[in-house]
C-alpha cells in the first residue's frame, strides 16, 4: 500500500491565479473527505496575496491530512518573456522551475498513490512524470467545452505545420466531432489568435500536442447535466484519439476554509449580509466581473448608470486594480459625487474580496452579472441563480456558451470582450431586466441546482468517480 496504514497519498501541483488554485484546493479537500493524505506543492512566491492567504487557510484547516512543500521558483527576467500579464509570466516561471521538483518529491516519507497537476504544466513535467512510480492526472480548471477545444487544437496544429492558430482557425470556427455546433472563432481566447507568436499561444500549442503522453486521466470540475455533450465527445474518442479518460468530478463544493479570516473581510461580509437580509426575495442583482482584470473607468460609469436604471437593488463588486494591489482612488473619484450618491441610494458597492458562494446563496439574490470565470459558473449553478454573462478575457466566452446552452442564463454576444467597446448603461439595464424577469431562466437554474446537489451528494457521480479512483490506486499499490 501507499503507507503502512494503507492510506492513499495524492500530491497536487497547482499553477498561478485564484482561478487555478481554488479548484485545486477544492479537489484536494474532496479527496481528504474520503480519507486520503494530501501533499500540496506550492509554487512560491505567489502572484497575489489572496493566493497565499488561501493556501495558508487550507493547510491550517487540515493540519493532520496535508503536507505542504514549497517549490521555490527560479528568477526569470521579465524582459525574456513576451508577456506583461503577471499570471502568464508566473505560468512560465513555474514551467522553468520544474526541474527542482524531483528533489522535493524525494522528501516525502510515504510513496505517492497519484500525482495531479495543472494543465499549464504538461510539457515540462513529462521528464518528471516519467520517473514517478505512480499514475499522473491532469486537472483542467475550466469547462469540458474549453478542454475539448484545447485537445482539438493539437489535431489542427498537426494538420497545419508551421502555421499559427490565427491562420488555421477560420471564420467558420473550430468544428469538434461530437459537438452539435462549432466553437466560433470569436469565442477563442484572443491571445491564441494573435498573428505573432506569444507566450500563451506557445504554451497552448506545446501542451495540447503532449496531452496524451504519460497521462492516466483528466479531472474536470463539471458534470453530465451541465456539459453532457462535451464529456461524451471527449470520452467517446471523438475529440482526440488516444485521449485518456476524462472524469467529471463537479460541481466541487466550496469549503469553510475559503472564508476570509481577516477582520476587514469579516466586517465587509457582515455588512453585506445585513443589507441583503433587508431586501425582498430575488430582488437583488449581484455584479462581479472577476478579480483578475480591472474595470475601465469609462465602463464603470456606464455600469453605474445601468444599475441605477434597471430598477433592481444591486450588490456590485468593483475591481479598479489588477491582482491584489491597493486601489488608489475611491469610486466617488471615478463616478463623481452626484452619480456616486445615486449608486449608494440603490445598492451596495464594495472593492474588497467577498464570499461569493454565500452571496449567491442568499434568498434576496435573484441574478448574477458575471464575467463567466469557470469557478463563478459552477458556483452559480450550485446555488441555482440565473446568470447574465459578460466575458472579459481568455476562456470566458466558452463558459458563457455553456451557461446559455444550459438554459439558465443569457449572453449578449454583441457586447464583445469586456476590454473592447464600452457597453452603454441603457443596454446593461435592458439585459439585467431581461434576466431578472425571465421565469424560464429561474426554473432551469433551479433544475440544474438540484442536478448539482445530486451529482455532489451521496451516491452521486462525483462521489462515485472519486471513490472509484481511490480504489484503483489502492489496487495499484497492492500489485506493486
UniProtKB/Swiss-Prot annotation:
Outcome reported for the amino acid change (mutating residue 202 to A): No effect on catalytic activity
Family matches, as Pfam families: UDPGT
Binding site for UDP-alpha-D-glucose: 141, 354, 356, 371, 374-376, 379, 395-396
Active site: 20, 118
SUPFAM superfamilies, alphabetized: UDP-Glycosyltransferase/glycogen phosphorylase (SSF53756)
Enzyme Commission number(s) of this protein: 2.4.1.360
GO MF terms, alphabetically ordered: 2-hydroxyflavanone C-glucosyltransferase activity; UDP-glucosyltransferase activity
Reaction catalysed by this enzyme: a 3'-hydro-2'-hydroxy-beta-oxodihydrochalcone + UDP-alpha-D-glucose = a 3'-(beta-D-glucopyranosyl)-2'-hydroxy-beta-oxodihydrochalcone + UDP + H(+)
Region feature UDP, mapped onto this chain: 291-292
Keyword field: Glycosyltransferase, Transferase
Enzyme class: transferase
Consequence of substituting residue 85 to A: Loss of catalytic activity
Binding site for an anthocyanidin: 20
Consequence when changing residue 20 to A: Loss of C-glucosyltransferase activity, but acquisition of O-glucosyltransferase activity
Keyword ATP-binding annotated: no
CDD domains: GT1_Gtf-like (cd03784)
Function: UDP-glucose-dependent glucosyltransferase catalyzing the c-glucosylation of the A ring of 2-hydroxynaringenin. Also active toward phloretin, but not toward naringenin and apigenin.
Family per record: Belongs to the UDP-glycosyltransferase family.
Protein name: UDP-glycosyltransferase 708D1
UniProt source species: Glycine max
Amino acid at each position: 500500500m501507499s503507507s503502512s496504514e494503507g492510506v492513499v497519498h495524492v500530491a497536487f501541483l497547482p499553477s498561478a491565479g485564484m482561478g487555478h488554485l481554488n479548484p485545486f484546493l477544492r479537489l484536494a479537500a474532496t479527496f481528504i473527505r474520503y480519507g486520503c493524505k494530501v501533499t500540496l506543492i506550492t509554487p512560491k512566491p505567489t502572484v497575489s496575496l489572496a493566493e497565499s492567504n488561501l493556501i495558508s487557510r487550507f493547510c491550517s484547516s487540515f493540519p493532520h491530512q496535508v503536507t505542504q512543500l514549497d517549490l521555490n521558483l527560479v528568477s526569470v527576467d521579465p524582459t525574456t518573456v513576451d508577456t506583461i500579464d503577471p499570471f502568464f509570466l508566473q505560468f512560465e516561471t513555474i514551467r522553468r522551475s520544474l526541474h527542482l521538483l524531483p528533489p522535493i518529491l524525494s522528501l516525502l516519507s510515504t510513496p505517492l498513490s497519484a500525482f495531479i497537476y495543472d494543465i499549464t504544466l504538461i510539457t515540462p513535467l513529462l521528464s518528471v512524470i516519467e520517473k514517478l512510480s505512480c499514475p499522473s492526472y491532469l486537472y483542467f480548471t475550466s469547462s469540458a467545452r474549453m478542454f475539448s477545444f484545447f485537445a482539438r487544437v493539437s489535431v489542427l496544429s498537426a494538420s497545419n505545420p508551421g502555421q499559427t492558430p490565427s491562420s488555421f482557425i477560420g471564420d467558420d470556427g473550430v468544428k469538434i466531432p461530437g459537438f452539435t455546433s462549432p466553437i466560433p472563432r470569436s469565442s477563442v481566447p484572443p491571445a491564441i489568435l494573435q498573428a505573432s507568436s506569444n507566450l500563451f499561444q506557445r504554451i497552448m500549442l506545446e501542451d495540447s500536442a503532449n496531452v496524451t503522453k504519460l497521462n492516466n486521466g483528466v479531472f474536470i470540475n463539471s458534470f453530465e447535466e451541465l456539459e453532457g455533450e462535451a464529456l461524451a465527445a471527449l470520452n467517446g474518442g471523438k475529440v482526440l484519439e488516444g485521449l485518456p479518460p476524462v472524469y467529471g468530478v463537479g460541481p466541487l463544493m466550496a469549503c469553510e476554509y475559503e472564508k476570509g479570516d481577516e477582520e476587514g473581510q469579516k466586517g465587509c461580509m457582515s455588512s453585506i449580509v445585513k443589507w441583503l437580509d433587508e431586501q425582498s426575495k430575488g430582488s437583488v442583482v449581484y455584479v462581479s466581473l472577476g478579480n483578475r482584470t480591472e474595470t475601465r473607468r469609462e465602463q464603470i460609469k456606464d455600469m453605474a448608470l445601468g444599475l441605477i436604471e434597471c430598477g433592481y437593488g444591486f450588490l456590485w463588486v468593483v475591481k479598479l486594480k489588477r491582482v491584489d494591489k491597493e486601489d488608489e482612488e475611491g469610486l466617488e473619484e471615478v463616478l463623481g459625487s452626484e452619480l456616486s450618491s445615486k449608486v449608494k441610494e440603490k445598492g451596495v458597492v464594495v472593492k474588497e474580496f467577498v464570499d461569493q458562494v454565500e452571496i449567491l446563496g442568499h434568498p434576496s439574490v435573484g441574478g448574477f452579472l458575471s464575467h463567466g470565470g469557470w469557478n463563478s459558473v459552477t458556483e452559480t449553478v450550485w446555488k441555482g441563480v440565473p446568470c447574465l454573462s459578460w466575458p472579459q478575457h481568455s476562456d470566458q466566452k466558452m463558459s458563457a456558451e455553456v451557461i446559455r446552452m444550459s438554459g439558465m442564463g443569457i449572453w449578449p454576444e454583441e457586447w464583445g470582450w469586456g476590454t473592447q467597446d464600452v457597453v452603454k448603461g441603457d443596454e446593461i439595464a435592458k439585459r439585467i431586466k431581461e434576466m431578472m424577469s425571465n421565469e424560464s431562466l429561474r426554473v432551469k437554474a433551479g433544475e440544474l441546482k438540484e442536478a448539482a446537489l445530486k451529482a455532489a451528494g451521496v451516491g452521486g457521480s462525483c462521489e462515485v468517480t472519486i471513490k472509484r479512483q481511490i480504489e484503483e490506486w489502492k489496487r495499484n499499490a497492492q500489485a506493486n
